[in-house]
Swiss-Prot record:
The gene is adk. Keywords: ATP-binding, Cytoplasm, Kinase, Nucleotide biosynthesis, Nucleotide-binding, Transferase. Catalyzes the reversible transfer of the terminal phosphate group between ATP and AMP. Plays an important role in cellular energy homeostasis and in adenine nucleotide metabolism. ATP binds at residues 10-15, 123, 132-133, 202. GO terms for cellular component: cytoplasm. It comes from Pseudomonas putida (strain GB-1). Its EC number is 2.7.4.3. AMP binds at residues 31, 36, 57-59, 85-88, 92, 156, 167. Consists of three domains, a large central CORE domain and two small peripheral domains, NMPbind and LID, which undergo movements during catalysis. The LID domain closes over the site of phosphoryl transfer upon ATP binding. Assembling and dissambling the active center during each catalytic cycle provides an effective means to prevent ATP hydrolysis. This is Adenylate kinase. InterPro entries: Adenyl_kin_sub, Adenylat/UMP-CMP_kin, Adenylat_kinase_CS, Adenylate_kinase_lid-dom, P-loop_NTPase. SUPFAM superfamilies: P-loop containing nucleoside triphosphate hydrolases. It comes from the Bacteria. GO terms for biological process: AMP salvage.
Length: 216
């Protein structure tokens, strides 16, 4: 089964991706990992990619699609794969269709922007240990201090409200249109890929149950 997981940053895709890959025994494929692996392996495509990246240029959709086709032909993808952060744009999605890369299921995890801002902007981290807290859902015993060491907690730049809002606005401009694209593709192709919209609010277990039901 080949699955695309859509959703804004902070919607909980990473958590659900882990459950999906374990349940179906399929690898999670990210373009970043694929790029690094191809360059390291020194394949003809890898060498071409290295040239582009060394020149500080953006890797074209055409090269990325070639990379995807090379990756999904590998033995560990025999039962399918989960695409992580790809496609990001309509041209990439169209290129996948044109290249004959069939997708079985597209799952959108939908979470309201304000909920995401609350989730992410409330995170606090103890850098030395990696322990994470949340000012609302999982607060430390003493405000701003790590429970174990009593050292200061910090808010990572990625979790600051203005950064979160910027990432959400990029998502709505670039990636949200994929929701319409795959809904229309599914309707035009007698339900292939199967498209599912899931509300990503509630307990992790409840959301996982909905995601797995959508894929069964």
């Amino acid at each position: 089964m080949r699955v695309i997981l859509l959703g804004a940053p902070g919607a909980g895709k990473g958590t659900q991706a882990k459950f999906i890959t374990e349940k179906f025994g399929i690898p999670q494929i990210s373009t970043g990992d694929m790029l690094r692996a191809a360059v390291k392996a020194g394949t003809p495509l890898g060498l071409e990619l290295k040239k582009v990246m060394d020149a500080g240029q953006l890797v074209s959709d055409e090269l990325i699609i070639s990379l995807v086709k090379e990756r999904i032909a590998q033995p560990d993808c025999a039962n399918g794969c989960l695409f992580d952060g790809f496609p990001r744009t309509i041209p990439q999605a169209e290129a996948m269709v044109a290249a004959g890369v069939d997708i079985d299921a597209v799952v959108e995890i939908a979470v309201d922007d304000e909920e995401i801002v609350g989730r992410m902007a409330g995170r606090r981290v103890h850098l030395a240990s990696g322990r994470t807290y949340h000012i609302q859902y999982n607060p430390p015993k003493v405000e701003g201090k790590d429970d174990v060491t009593g050292e200061d907690l910090i808010q990572r730049d990625d979790d600051k409200e203005e950064t979160v809002r910027h990432r959400l606005s990029v998502y709505h401009t670039q990636t949200k249109p994929l929701v319409d694209f795959y809904q229309k593709l599914s309707a035009a192709n007698a339900g292939k890929p199967k498209y599912s919209h899931i509300e990503g609010v509630g307990s992790v277990d409840a959301i996982t149950a909905k995601v797995l039901a959508a894929l069964s």
